[in-house]
Structures are given as structure tokens and as C-alpha cells.
Amino acid sequence: MTFRRIHTDQSAWFCVFRSDQTGEHVLYAALREKDFPEVAMRLTADETTLFRDRPTDFLALARDFIASHDSPVYSSRKITFRSHGVDLIEVV
């Protein structure tokens, strides 16, 4: 499934992608570590609403994901993906 970039926050180094097919959203982040590894997770319906209606609270969620992406809270929600340029990712 392919997701198109709909939002970028350069200060926090994350993007939100959306599937035109399903409406599902993905949070993507480039980590500020050696070689800038990339991680992504699917957003729940509540998190998607937070992104749309309460951007300040969503920013806190994104920052927490970036800082704690290996924690049990997020590790089971992470997805494997391939980047297709800067505007598209494909979940594999």
C-alpha cells in the first residue's frame, strides 16, 4: 500500500503520510542518530484526530515516538516500508 506525504514538521524531523486508498495515516520520522535511520508507525483513529484537531498535542506524540520508538509502547506498532522519493512510502 502506498502513502503520500501530507504534512512535514522540519523542526521535529517528522512527516505524516496518508493512503489515498484507505485513508489510513502513518507517522514517519528520521532519527537524529548516526546515518539518520528512518522509522514509521501506523496511527490509530484517535491519533489521526489528534493530528487534525490538536496539532500541539500531536507534536508531543510525534516527539515521544521519536525519542522512544524502541519502547514496548511503539515497537509493536512500527511498520516496514520503502521510500519512493520524499513524497511517497510503500508499506511492505
Predicted feature residues:
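Extended, alpha-helix-rich binding/interface surfaces that flank or overlap catalytic cores
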Residues: M1-V92
